[in-house]
């Protein structure tokens, strides 16, 4: 349930008064023309057509100084930063000949796969057809062509070996024209998954479409096997156009249910026919009860690191294993196990962080909580207890991008104390005396406060991608001097288009409530006048480890509501949200549905005190976890909200996936946390919806938060004789895409305008 990362149409939070400290107006004035006579407000059509969407530029690095990029006319172009050389490596004609939408160059640069017939499955997974193009001869390889559709395909890190997954089994090709070698034979739809995750691991643990990993030089291939044979199945109808609907069946472990059985195997990719796959042992302290595999990291061709979690996800074990040539097995001694345990919540953030190994192939860097409860980078050589803390402070390290022999590159929200910012830092390591440098803090400071980065081999060069708060911009930099080499994308066309638009104003501030800090973003109408009264819409996600109040650029549905309809929008990061320390993050542990809701209500009361909110016109809306929070807020009995919208909400945690739910709630058993599972349902509050206008929305083919959730809410409301509105989208999943998107936002707009008594 990571909808907060994907909602395209959200972003907003609140504004203007004492009690609140530290304000920054996010949207730069350069994209706002104050001459109202020549500008217009945003329209809903602008949003639905993506008129003001921005571009980013991520180089597809193929060496320390070379990268590929797909041009606007669909040519794949090669660039050498140091020589200035540039040429088309794959023409749009070649791409079009097989209707390719994606490509992948082999490391030896002799071949490229072209991907077509994309067919989406779940959040990350899809199937596709793959054609192999011989770049030397300028033709497609016809001998021993790949089967179709393929579930996953990848090149080895060196040369041009291919590994792919077809019908849940793994195959290997030494060369693209060679016949395939079948590695696994037990793959079976919805039963045994080899090299690809099942639904719950894809969505809630790995966050990828693959579960196979090449060793650094392609000597070995590691893969996961997921056995879903005993997992309960969720079944729902897909109506299509046929006389009878078909039934979709997905092995889906809900809270407390039987989980998949996972095993990790490694096979010699050079001589796979001589020695079969070898299983990697699970640490004894993990294997003694239900457990999860959380990630795999190759260190060298003969050393691998695996991470495991207990089912109650407060204990993680990192196990380093070495290949024994004499026995042709993988040895994982207990002395090479490192335990990470949380006594106040779950292990890690949303996921347990992965290690980044240093050049000695023994020690590594990893992000986990320090003694003060903030997530920071630590250096581990022998034991976690003896870890050396690399970063510290009342802020958090977010991601380690790259470790070289003399530098460590990472992102954090340290600069100026704003949790919703991201800057890129370099720390010197190795023989140099440690020193820290912020690479991005003072680059285009007004425009850019939220960065990510993409590094070439050995961090020789890197691209910075700024997401806001001003217009996004992508730039190329020298990895040794940090000097900007060139602008890759500056969104100049978007800048010119926005000169004629009355954009809303955005502010980020914070509320102090008792000993809690609530950061919020408020989106204000262009001609905002604090002496007037405005309707207020709260946009909420609120799930554990999420963050809504970020310094990023977006022209979205809520931008339109502020610009055209004169609605004030607010987003609030309350307890349970991320990157502000464990005290705030773990406050919701085993108590979902309590503090997230309380903090939204508290913020609304503070906004009313500011004097410009019409307290008779306040609404709340959210999607997924946000739909759950908005539903509970509406049913809180406070009388604050006139109306609200819940899109694809969870209604009971017993209905949601085991890995996600149990991470934050424990098990739904009498001797664990069943009582709160029962007390935290939306249905238990059905009577309290009587005095609000409630719009309930769901897709009937939602594989993530099943339609069952909204069906149970509707049943409870009917049984309580509570009037409400509902909209379902046939055959639509959790994202409600395509034509459903336009219908959804049009429908929600009408609902809000009616609630707020706004004219059409």
UniProtKB/Swiss-Prot annotation:
It catalyses: Release of an N-terminal dipeptide, Xaa-Yaa-|-Zaa-, from a polypeptide, preferentially when Yaa is Pro, provided Zaa is neither Pro nor hydroxyproline; Hydrolysis of Pro-|-Xaa >> Ala-|-Xaa in oligopeptides. One of its GO terms (biological process) is proteolysis involved in protein catabolic process. GO terms for cellular component: anchoring junction; apical part of cell; basal part of cell; cell surface; extracellular space; lamellipodium membrane; peptidase complex; plasma membrane. Its EC number is 3.4.21.26, 3.4.14.5, 3.4.21.-. Glycans are attached at residues 49, 92, 99, 227, 314, 679. Pfam families: DPPIV_N, Peptidase_S9. Residues 1-4 are cytoplasmic. Signal peptide: none annotated. One of its GO terms (molecular function) is dipeptidyl-peptidase activity. N-glycosylated. The N-terminus may be blocked. Residues 26-760 are extracellular. The chain crosses the membrane at residues 5-25. Substrate binds at residues 203-204. The record marks 23-24 as: Cleavage. Keywords: Angiogenesis, Apoptosis, Cell adhesion, Cell junction, Cell membrane, Cell projection, Cleavage on pair of basic residues, Coiled coil, Disulfide bond, Glycoprotein, Hydrolase, Membrane, Protease, Secreted, Serine protease, Signal-anchor, Transmembrane, Transmembrane helix. It is an enzyme of class 3 (hydrolase). Disulfide bonds join 321-332, 438-441, 448-466, 643-755. InterPro entries: AB_hydrolase_fold, Pept_S9_AS, Peptidase_S9_cat, Peptidase_S9B_N, Serine_Prot_S9B/DPPIV. Homodimer; homodimerization is required for activity of both plasma membrane and soluble forms. The monomer is inactive. Heterodimer with DPP4. Interacts with PLAUR; the interaction occurs at the cell surface of invadopodia membranes. Interacts with ITGB1. Interacts with ITGA3. Associates with integrin alpha-3/beta-1; the association occurs in a collagen-dependent manner at the cell surface of invadopodia membranes. Cell surface glycoprotein serine protease that participates in extracellular matrix degradation and involved in many cellular processes including tissue remodeling, fibrosis, wound healing, inflammation and tumor growth. Both plasma membrane and soluble forms exhibit post-proline cleaving endopeptidase activity, with a marked preference for Ala/Ser-Gly-Pro-Ser/Asn/Ala consensus sequences, on substrate such as alpha-2-antiplasmin SERPINF2 and SPRY2. PANTHER family: PROLYL ENDOPEPTIDASE FAP, PROTEASE FAMILY S9B,C DIPEPTIDYL-PEPTIDASE IV-RELATED. Belongs to the peptidase S9B family. This is Prolyl endopeptidase FAP. It comes from Bos taurus. The lineage of its organism: Eukaryota, Metazoa, Chordata, Craniata, Vertebrata.
